[in-house]
């Protein structure tokens, strides 16, 4: 019975690399976690710690440390599979667990980008712009993935499948039609979606083979190919929808803008958060580049802002909004652009702004969310 429950704990709609490699190992760790009575959140934090140490190894820049970082990144994602399997095995699901699993994945991935850029800098390479562009690409894709899936679910169109739910660890998986497909075509479709397993495999292997510069060359190319295929299908499906914006607070809760609304895109409003993030990040990149201030500090500033937008996303997926006071302290898109523009052109010390955003978006906002949901450990 235990073996059957363990087998049934596998998540549906998983990626090729996860199914045929990662979960072969994660099942063993899940069995061990059950025996020692570990909780899903404890496993998530272990995976988080391993992922952060992986990023730290990448900062060293040497081949041996890069190899260690690549191996640890794979171990991190194997352990990351365990928290979901353990939750499904024990039937212990929580909003806190879903939020923690989602945000730690994003932090690990972007800290690895940071680590690779720092390591490359020690070898005389300037890869800050590619690292930031890769973070922007992934943010644009992630937000649109989640929002498209939830929009389809809300519209409840008969021609779409019900998408994977937020609590089921959605990452790069798009709803598929019910028509049967050949096994090869099915798995090729999974791979080209470029989910987290495949992404982290590419990061690990490319960093070992050719270093950070190779990683930041290969990753955007593969991400672009994936986006071309995925968005082609999504646009076709969206054109079949009613010419009306989505209902509820899903999109409005992610606006984070006093002026920019993009209401004109109507049925394509699932793209609104991604487009707003692209506008803000590209303008910040332009400001920092022309002022020659692309470095660790500016990466941290943009990362904390990106984290803030992910926080808004995860709250909206649970039909919640960030408290007004937190949004006001975050200055909205317009306020942040004004502040950072003045600071960059005025040659201020940007470290203070980085600390402010880190304390606000990473610490205060996270604590507010966790404390507000402590009473809902199991749903």
Describe each model-derived feature in a short phrase:
Residues 37, 57-61, 287-290, 346:
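Helix-loop junctions at the membrane-solvent interface of multi-pass transporters
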Residues 1-30, 103-379:
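A feature for the membrane-embedded catalytic helix bundles of lipid/isoprenoid biosynthetic enzymes
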Residues 40-96, 113, 130-134, 215-217, ...:
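Membrane-embedded alpha-helical segments that form the functional core of polytopic membrane enzymes
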Residues 27-34, 84, 88-91, 98, ...:
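Short amphipathic alpha-helical coupling elements at transmembrane boundaries
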Residues 94-98, 320-323:
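Loop-to-transmembrane helix entry/capping segments in MFS-fold secondary transporters
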Residues 36, 49-51, 167-168:
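Short acidic/polar alpha-helix capping motifs at helix-coil junctions
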